[in-house]
Design a protein with these regions (language model features):
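Condensing-enzyme catalytic core mediating Claisen C-C bond formation in acyl metabolism
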Residues: 1-51, 55, 59, 153-165
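Short helix-to-loop capping/linker segments positioned immediately adjacent to catalytic or ligand/cofactor-binding
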Residues: 49, 64-67
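Claisen-condensing/thiolase-fold acyl-transfer catalytic domains that form or cleave C-C bonds
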Residues: 54-59, 65, 73-165
Length: 165
């Protein structure tokens, strides 16, 4: 889904087609939060993003489970966008699920944006997928504000070794 009313919660003010980059956009200026930035740097309204994530992600996961008659307790793992551990822990608490069902990799890789869900699967769950079929709910959320939730079963996938450049 998407909620365009939150378009400015995570935004790069210039660049692209909406506001094309001009030379003066690269000059550092004092921003509302007291930090010096140029207009090409991303800005985030942290509390708006936090509120969005901890409200929308659990709701989306519950809607998916209801639509497909899944019991949340029967899902092996919940693989969430690895943006912020506090956000993911709040989502986990709202779903009333154990810590073991929420793998993390952000301590190693940080916020890897759209790569965070597959990266978490290959670094945290790959070995277990060779031993048994795993039921997984993935939920990503971010810029826009936008979100997506998926349920899938993973059994003996072909997963390449992690390549670090």
């Amino acid at each position: 889904g998407t909620d365009g009313s939150g378009y400015d919660a995570i935004i790069r003010p210039v660049g692209g087609t909406r506001n094309q980059l001009k030379a003066e956009d690269l000059e550092l200026k004092m921003c509302e939060d007291g930090r010096m930035r140029h207009q090409l740097q991303t800005r985030m309204k942290g509390m708006d993003v936090f509120s969005f994530a901890i409200t929308t992600a659990p709701k989306s996961i519950k809607q998916l489970a209801e639509q497909y008659e899944l019991s949340l307790d029967d899902v092996d793992y919940y693989v969430l966008h690895q943006a912020n551990r506090m956000i993911n822990e709040k989502i986990r608490a709202k779903l009333k699920q154990s810590e073991e069902k929420f793998p993390y990799n952000m301590m190693t890789f940080g916020n890897t944006s759209s790569a965070s869900i597959p990266l978490t699967i290959i670094t945290q769950l790959a070995k277990e997928t060779l031993e048994r079929t795993l039921s997984i709910i993935g939920c990503g959320f971010g810029v826009g504000l936008s979100w997506g939730t998926v349920y899938f079963e993973l059994s003996n996938p072909i997963i390449s070794k992690l390549v670090e450049l």
